[in-house]
Amino acid sequence: MDDVVKSLLQRTTSSLTKPAPARPSREEAEAAVEVLLRWTGDDPSREGLRDTPKRVVKAFEEFFSGYNADASDVLSRVFEEVHGYDNMVLVRDIPFSSHCEHHMVPFFGVAHIGYYPSEAGVIGLSKLARLVDIFAKRLQTQEALTAQIIGAIDEHLQPRGCAIMLEAEHMCMSMRGVQKHGTSTLTTQFTGVFKNDPAEQVRFFGMVRNPKS
């Protein structure tokens, strides 16, 4: 695995390897939402907010479902019948949504993933989309999300090289603070032949931006 990716993964996943604190009950989570509603200055007992704590907790189960998923389950099977394919596999424009770990507000965009398969075979295309969701459905930074996705691919598929680019708009920048709507953040990471050969990076970017080239 690429040393840069490994270093970032060690920092971003260290908290996941520690013993998890006891998870509050559903009732405790709903009570916490009610406290926040009162903190905003609103009345949780009014009709429009009466069921909001339950709805928020249910939504959080979906938003953060990645904590209950394992990348190894998604990447454990490859298609050996395409053994011998040695060119790039690229999946473009994979939509994702995540939540910033600093403000717990959404960021969303698309992921582009390219890799050169190893002799073991190729992964199902839908598996790459599922992999993105596993890590996106957690509290994240875009940089860590980028590293975690490519790190999982490197670890489980051991490709000859992998390239990833994430493009996202962050609501913590659009809705608060500087409030710059429409601003995009791009992150990239390369391993193997992509890291060692700038021409492969150019090819990856070209296929992402102009797939007919």
From Swiss-Prot:
UniProt record similarity statement: Belongs to the GTP cyclohydrolase I family.
Q: How does it assemble?
A: Homomer.
From the UniProt record, report the name of the gene that encodes this protein: folE
**Name of the top EC class for this enzyme:** hydrolase
Q: Enumerate the residue ranges of region (Disordered).
A: 1-27
Protein's recorded name: GTP cyclohydrolase 1
* Source organism: Beijerinckia indica subsp. indica (strain ATCC 9039 / DSM 1715 / NCIMB 8712)
Q: Which branch of life, at top level? A: Bacteria
Any Pfam family:
GTP_cyclohydroI
Could you say which EC number(s) this protein's record lists? Answer: 3.5.4.16
Mind listing the UniProt keywords for this protein, alphabetically? GTP-binding, Hydrolase, Metal-binding, Nucleotide-binding, One-carbon metabolism, Zinc
Give the reaction(s) catalysed.
Answer: GTP + H2O = 7,8-dihydroneopterin 3'-triphosphate + formate + H(+)
Q: Which HAMAP family match?
A: FolE
